[in-house]
Structure formats: C-alpha cells, structure tokens
C-alpha cells in the first residue's frame, strides 16, 4: 500500500493521502485560476494534496481540492485568517530550495486586477518579497507561532514547517522541537521565477543530499 497519514502527532484530523506524492506551492498569479482548479481536481482524483503557494487561497482550488495545504509565507501577501480554517493543513514557510535565505520579486506584469485585490497591492508595479516573517525571529518564536496556528484551527489540522536545503540536520531538529507535525525539505532543484539567477544556480543543496542528515 502507498497510503500515508500525516499529522498524527498533534492534529485531530491528520492528512490522509493515497500516494506519498504531493503538489508543492505555486502561486495564483503565476498560475491562472483555472490552472489552480485543474490541479485541485487532479489531486482529488489521485488521492493526494496540493498547496496554495504565494498570494493566498482561491475559491477555485479550495472548491476542487480534497486536500489543500495553506502556505503561510514571510511576506503575507493575500494571507487571510479565515482561509487558515478552511485548509486541511498549514505549511509555515521558512525557506525555499531555489532561494534559501532570500526573498523574492513579484513582477508587475503578474499583478492583474484580481491578484492586486487579493494581495492588496497596486496593479502592474514590481513588489519585493521579504525573506523573514514579521512576527517571529527564531526557533523559540516558531514554537509560539505553531501554537497560535493550532489555537486558530482548534488543533484540527497538521502544521508543516518548510525548510530549504541548506542546514538540514539543524533546521529539521529545530522544526521538530518547535512542534511541527511534518517537516518539508525543499532542495535546490526547485524552480522559481521570483529571485535572482545567482540564487537559483548556486545556493542550496540537492534534495537527496539533504535527506540523510535531516
């Protein structure tokens, strides 16, 4: 069997998947609403999960996704506390494999009327994305943040912590100590259109090389 259950450590409603393969976060804006809807339908048929990505949750993907993971990112564009309660899991993003330790750039050409409304941004203007969360700064604060998210969701859903492939041994240990149900390890092969080439090509470690120390 390929069934996987995630979140049995604390969550009242662990995430149950038929296959151990999921779709990582891709933002609304980089993808259209219909593409997000199609991914939701696909994962529902396959029995796995998809992830919101930057910019928040769209009604299309929530309506079609049996299992939807809500990403809580440092820059909080499109973050809606009510959507946290609609998610089947929450992923606190500390790092991204394609740009560990770095923020990003949301190009103005991606900011349509709808994207601008969801993210509370001016249309057509480039926006830099922060690399640090505004309300916590270290592992002790992360523990408090995870508890806050559990209270918001009434301890129902698993809390993931996503780390970049940089210091897998130490970062995994800190995430577990902070109370994460799942640690998501993102290696340098991950792609992004929202950072400099020097990050994409030269920073981070491959996923397979990170698994053993993690």
Q: At which residue positions do the language-model features occur?
A:
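Glycine-rich phosphate/ribose-binding loops and adjacent secondary-structure elements
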Residues: 133-214
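N-terminal capping/small domains of soluble enzymes
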Residues: 1-133, 141
């Amino acid at each position: 069997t390929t069934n996987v259950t995630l979140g049995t450590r604390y969550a009242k409603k662990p995430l149950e998947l038929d296959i151990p393969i999921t779709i990582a976060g891709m933002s609304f804006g980089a993808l259209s609403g219909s593409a997000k809807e199609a991914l939701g339908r696909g994962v529902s048929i396959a029995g796995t999960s998809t992830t919101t990505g930057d910019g928040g949750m769209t009604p299309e993907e929530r309506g079609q996704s049996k299992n939807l993971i809500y990403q809580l990112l440092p820059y909080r564009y499109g973050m809606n506390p009510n959507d946290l309660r609609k998610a089947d899991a929450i992923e606190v993003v500390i790092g991204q494999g394609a740009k560990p330790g770095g923020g990003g750039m949301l190009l103005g050409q991606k900011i349509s009327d709808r994207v601008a409304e969801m993210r509370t941004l001016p249309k057509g203007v480039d926006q830099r994305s922060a690399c640090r969360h505004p309300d916590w700064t270290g592992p002790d604060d992360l523990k408090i943040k995870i508890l806050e998210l559990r209270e918001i969701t009434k301890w129902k859903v698993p809390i993931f912590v996503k780390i970049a492939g940089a210091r897998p041994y130490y970062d995994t240990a800190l995430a577990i100590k902070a109370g994460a149900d799942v640690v998501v390890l993102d290696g340098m092969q991950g792609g992004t259109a929202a950072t400099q080439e020097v990050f994409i090509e030269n920073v981070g470690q491959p996923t397979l090389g990170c698994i053993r120390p993690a």
